[in-house]
Regions:
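A glycine-/small-polar-enriched, mobile loop at the entrance of the PLP active site in fold-type I
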Residues: 11-31
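Conserved SAM-binding loop
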Residues: 47, 70, 185
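Conserved small/polar residues in nucleotide/adenosyl-binding loops
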Residues: 1-7, 255-259
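PLP-dependent aminotransferase-like
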Residues: 60-147, 154
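Short amphipathic alpha-helical/adjacent loop interface patches that line ligand
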Residues: 29, 33, 52, 72, ...
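Phosphate-binding glycine-rich loop
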Residues: 25-67, 81-83, 91, 158
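Active-site region of PLP-dependent enzymes
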Residues: 17, 150-156, 163-257
Length: 259
């Protein structure tokens, strides 16, 4: 399997040498965005160099202010992205069943400074997206999901990337789908030009050849990362099946263990 994938990747990157276009939203980058939109059943995918920058620049693009309710049970990046935007994280405890945010405790944490909720899907378990949506609508809050653990998951026929105002994915090499390093922001609808704003923010805030209208960063996914993503996406269903078999084996052995 590994030898086959290596040869497939070599074939994929030959186009990069032929085009002499190594980065800056080239053909592989654009192709991967389109393929992921189809796979995730979402209107828009914006690729980034890594998941952290995807989340940090998404928060910036949505102009959040004040306080953001999030979970302490997550990788450090989630909180760092909030703090690096000058916002205050307010931690909501998790429930003991699946370690996602305890929705019964969210409203008590909302103040007049709260602008958003950033829940985290954990170990493939989705948050209570319906309850969170109801709370957010009631209090006029944005919802951004850290979906790094749930690539490809569906709920009631909807892809995980379609919930909330937007979702962030990590495509780090440890994930079931990866681009070596990488990440993405996914969302439905136009949302006041969010795709264009994200495009600018990950490219130094450059809007066009003469206009720089935001303080941005260099967070573009390069062509070699995108090529790896295109290769891995073709085999993703098989990789998910492999992991499912491993989970089933662990569950069986632990369930029958005397320890």
């Amino acid at each position: 399997g590994d030898v086959y994938k290596r040869q497939e990747y070599i074939e994929e990157i030959k186009d990069i040498w032929d085009s002499h276009w190594l980065t800056n939203m080239g053909a592989k980058h654009n192709e991967l965005e389109k393929e992921l939109e189809k796979y995730l059943k979402v209107d828009h995918v914006s690729l980034f160099s890594n998941g952290h920058m995807a989340l940090e620049l998404l928060i910036q693009a949505l102009h959040l202010t004040g306080e953001v309710i999030t979970t302490p049970f997550t990788f450090a990046s989630t909180t760092h992205a909030i703090v690096r935007n000058g916002l205050t994280p307010v931690f909501c405890d998790v429930n003991p069943e699946d370690y996602t945010m305890d929705v019964s405790k969210i409203e008590a944490l909302i103040t007049d400074k709260t602008s958003a909720i950033i829940p985290v899907h954990v170990y493939g378990n989705l948050c209570d997206v319906e309850a969170i949506e109801a709370i957010a609508k009631k209090h006029h809050l944005k919802v951004i999901y850290d979906a790094a653990h749930t690539f490809g998951v569906t709920y009631k026929g909807r892809g995980v990337a379609t919930f909330g105002d937007a979702s962030m994915f990590s495509f780090h090499a440890t994930k079931v789908f990866h681009t070596i390093e990488g990440g993405a922001v996914c969302f439905n609808g136009e949302q006041n030009g969010l795709k264009e704003d994200l495009y600018g923010l990950k490219n130094f805030g450059i809007r066009n050849e003469v206009v720089v209208d935001a303080v941005g960063a260099n967070s573009k996914m390069n062509e070699f990362q995108a090529a790896m993503g295109l290769c891995n996406l073709r085999h993703l269903d098989g990789e998910i099946e492999k992991r499912s078999r491993v989970v089933a084996r662990y569950s069986c052995l632990l369930y029958t263990s005397d320890a």
